[in-house]
Amino acid sequence: MTLILASQSSGRAAMLRAAGLAFETTAAHVDEEMLTASLRAAGQTPRNIADALAEAKAVKIASRLPGVTVIGADSTLALDDGSMLAKPETPEEAADHLRRMAGRRHRLFSAAVAARDGAPIWRAIGEAKLWIRPLSDAFIADYVAQNWDSIRWTVGCYEIEGAGVQLFDRVEGDPWTIIGMPMLPLLTWLRATGLAPQ
């Protein structure tokens, strides 16, 4: 059976490769901004939005490829005041996000949904709590300048597996959820369905 990751995230692909899985990647091209805005307007939580985005990606690809198992994944970031941050579109927006998060806790929700024949067949959502230390404007400017090419694709403006680890005072949650996918539940399910080695 073929396994497809419906994501352009290098971090998610690296996690699956490191786990020894055979898979292909295909971008789903879901309008995440529009879907998120619609779900927020309907009163959905950041947790549910991560799940809905992951499902939309998986179902979109799975509906075109009969019999193929597709994994969609997405992450959302919520500040303690309930506001959500999206992927930054410019270095200036990344710096603004980091200023908003500095000295505060935020929650990161990472969802994975498996779909086959256009319908979801499995899902999991992980949650991590992260505390970003106080950051100076000079540190933020240097960090964004040095890491823009990688952080532009992340909701929190960091890759914790790289230079982003310098941002944090404290982290609660598994590292895979922070990188972008609830890997342990996913691997358990893939083994149970024969898509990963026992």
UniProtKB/Swiss-Prot annotation:
Top-level lineage group = Bacteria
List the GO cellular component terms: cytoplasm
- Extract the InterPro entries matched here: ITPase-like_fam (IPR029001), Maf-like (IPR003697)
Gene3D superfamilies cross-referenced by the UniProt entry:
3.90.950.10
Q: What EC numbers are recorded for this enzyme? A: 3.6.1.9
- Which top EC class applies here? hydrolase
Q: Which GO terms describe its biological process?
A: nucleotide metabolic process
Active site (record annotation): D74 (proton acceptor)
Family membership, please give it: Belongs to the Maf family.
Q: Which HAMAP family match?
A: Maf
- Tell me what this protein is called: Nucleoside triphosphate pyrophosphatase
